[in-house]
């Protein structure tokens, strides 16, 4: 806790805990000279904030966090964006991630919505489980995501962005989360993959009540095909979970 590993010049890899079977999320800090850019943030929990406080006076000491980049809208990646923004950091992410995060944090529910209950039935939920869930408080996004103030910088497919003294091409993936941003360095062999590019586990491809006819598997497969022309064996992929890895062409084929 409160420690980092240097994985490339000016690139720090840090790990934050998650209260689930997949018990961690990877976050990264890239040296922008007079400040840091942080890629993803972890959940908004007391424990995660405490770890960040250690990181800010430890490996990141001496310069502020000037920018947060969110790869996608899931709470383990975007949970503390608002906390960093209150400390002066700017926020960059895709429009879809921004809108989903704002919408979900402002839309808590004490019990499942009628649409969610109908989706449970449509999906064949066990009757006993359905009866129990009807009156249970569901997970709410705001349970582990700090409120995000208005104002962000949009990331788009095909853009070039400078982070940590490198120029990166932004390429979007889908399936795990809509408009998931990945970053491919033009200056060395680094790729920031978020949950779109993972080494030894498959990203969750979920269908939810908000879009019950979605086909995330098709979205995922199309994304893998789009990435293949840019993948090389020597790229070091820094993903959202597990370990950094090489051999991206084979991994895209496996996924």
Task: Describe the role of every protein-language-model region.
Residues 15-17, 95, 241:
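Residues at the C-termini of beta-strands that transition into short coil/loop
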Residues 44-48, 53-161, 189, 254:
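Active-site HxH/HxHxD metal-binding segment of metal-dependent hydrolases
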Residues 15-18, 77, 172:
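Conserved HGGG/HGGXW glycine-rich cap/lid loop of the alpha/beta-hydrolase fold
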Residues 36-46, 141-153, 160, 167-253:
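Metallo-beta-lactamase
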Residues 24, 100-106, 201-205:
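Short, charged, surface-exposed secondary-structure boundary motifs
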Residues 7-14, 137-144, 164-166:
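Short Pro/Gly-enriched beta-strand edge/turn motifs at strand-loop
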Residues 3-63, 183-199:
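Conserved beta-strand hairpin/beta-sheet module of binuclear metal-dependent hydrolase folds
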């Amino acid at each position: 806790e409160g420690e980092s590993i240097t994985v490339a010049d000016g690139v720090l890899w840090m790990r934050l805990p998650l209260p689930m079977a997949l018990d961690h999320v990877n976050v990264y800090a890239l040296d922008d000279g007079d400040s840091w850019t942080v890629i993803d943030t972890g959940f908004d929990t007391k424990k995660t904030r405490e770890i960040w406080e250690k990181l800010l006076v430890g490996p990141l000491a001496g310069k502020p966090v000037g920018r947060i980049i969110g790869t996608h809208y899931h709470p383990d990646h975007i949970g503390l964006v608002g906390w960093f923004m209150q400390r002066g950091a700017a926020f960059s992410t895709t429009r879809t991630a921004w809108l989903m995060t704002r919408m979900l944090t402002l839309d808590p529910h004490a019990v499942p919505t009628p649409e969610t209950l109908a989706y449970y039935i449509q999906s064949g939920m066990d009757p006993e489980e359905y009866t129990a869930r009807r009156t249970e408080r569901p997970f709410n996004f705001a349970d582990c995501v700090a409120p995000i103030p208005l104002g962000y910088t949009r990331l788009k497919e095909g853009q070039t962005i400078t982070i940590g003294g490198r120029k990166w091409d932004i390429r979007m993936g889908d399936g795990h989360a809509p408009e998931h941003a990945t970053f491919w360095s033009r200056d060395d062999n680094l790729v920031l993959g978020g949950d779109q590019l993972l080494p030894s586990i498959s990203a969750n491809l979920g269908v939810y009540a908000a879009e019950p006819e979605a086909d995330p598997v098709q979205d995922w497969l199309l994304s893998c095909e789009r990435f293949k022309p840019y993948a090389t064996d020597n790229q070091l992929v820094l993903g959202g979970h597990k370990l950094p890895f090489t051999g991206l062409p084979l991994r895209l084929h496996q996924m």
